Amino acid sequence: MRRRLCAHFADHGPRLACVLAAALLSVLPGRAQDQTVRVIAFGAHPDDCDLGAGGLAAKYAAQGHKVKFVSLTNGDAGHQSQHGEELAKRRRAEAQEAGRRIGIEYEVLDNHDGKLLPTLEVREQVIREIRQWKADIVIAPRPNDYHPDHRYTGVLVQDASYMVIVPNLVTDTPPLKRNPVFLYYSDRFTRPQPFRPDIIVSIDDVFDKKVSMLDAHVSQFYE
C-alpha cells in the first residue's frame, strides 16, 4: 500500500491537482525552491499532529525545512486511570520526545483536554503561534470533526487565518507580511462535503519515522 499525506486548501483559491512534495513548495508565494520553508501544524491533543502530518514533518525536516507541531490542549483527560497535571506532564514529555525523534519542535499548550472552545483567548494563542513561527504553511483539521476539541481546533485556525496579517490585533506579536498557505489534514467525514485532496505527499520513505513518533506517545497507544 502506498502511504501518503493528503491535504486540502483551506482557502478558496485555485485548486491544484495531486502533486508530490516538491510541488507543494512551489505554491508558496515568493518562495524559491531552495529556500527554507517553515511549517506549523495544529492538533487538539498531543499525538494528533503526528497522526495527521508526522510523515510530512519527517520528510521536510530531513530536507532542512523547519517544522513545528502545536497541541492546543495538554491531554490531561484522555486516559483510563491518570488525569490532571500528572497526565498533562507526561503527555508533554511524550510529545517533546516525538518531536526530538524527527528533529522538529513540539509545543503543548495548557488548555484542558475535552474543554477546548473557540474563544478569543485561544484564537489569539493560535495567531501568536503562527506569527512567532513565521509560518509559510499552516496545517489543521477541518472544522467538521465528530470530536469537539478537533472541530474547534479547525475553527480556531480558520478564524486566525486572516488575522495573522492584521497589525492592530494581537499587538504583542508582529504580524506576518503575507498569509501562509493553509491546508487541512485528510479525513473521512462526508458532511458537509467529503474531503477532496488538492495535494498528496508520498511518505513511503519516512513512514518508519512517523511510526517512531507515534511510539513515543506511550500513554496514548500502549495503555
What spans do the regions from the language model cover?
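N-terminal secretory signal peptides that target proteins for export/translocation
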Residues: 1-12
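General helical structural elements
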Residues: 6-8, 19, 95
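Intrinsic disorder/low-complexity detector
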Residues: 10-14, 52, 200
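Active-site rim/loop-helix segments in enzyme catalytic domains that contact anionic ligands
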Residues: 32-133, 155, 163
